[in-house]
Amino acid sequence: MGPRLRGDDKLNFSLAKSQTPFIWGRFTGLGLAAGLAALLLDQAVKLWLLFGYDLAEEGAVAVTPFFDLVLVWNKGISYGLFQQESAVGQWVLLGLKLAAVVLLWVWMTRVDTKWSAVSIGLIIGGAIGNAIDRIAYGAVADFAHFHITTTAWTFSWYVFNLADAAIVVGVAGLLYESLFGGRAVKAPRSGP
């Protein structure tokens, strides 16, 4: 048997036990829901395109005059940056991604707005979605290609996937909130 606690001690113990800032915060559930939605949608679309429709065998599909479905295997990070052909490079990228997810989770447990929690959750969901690809296939499956072609010029955006889009939307959400949202900090007035 352990020591007997007074009523006040029991209350303090239960409060301390429920406050786990590195695991769960005020809006962590909302961020987790956003991240899971991004992850599940990303993986479902990739699985359907790879194994249901078989985009690799069928080839590019012109969905609209400015949007195609194509299959590109990305061995780098978002938008094809830092391509890694070696297994060591792939594992280094995976390790960095895991570290980023852990740090983002800790950040998400500490935010005080729903907007930030959802934004960070989208980034985490996108990062995990691409990490699953890297583990399963050795590269990330990218498939969305926006482009504009006229008689004079052609604009072609990077090929990306829904995980990349979730990361970009999450970063944009954090930037928006840092610039326009949250509580305004006013400088103290000088003088009497």
What are the residue ranges of the model-derived segments?
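Alpha-helical transmembrane bundles and membrane-interface segments of multipass inner-membrane proteins
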Residues: 8-192
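A cross-taxon signal for low-complexity, glycine/charged-rich
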Residues: 1-2, 7-8
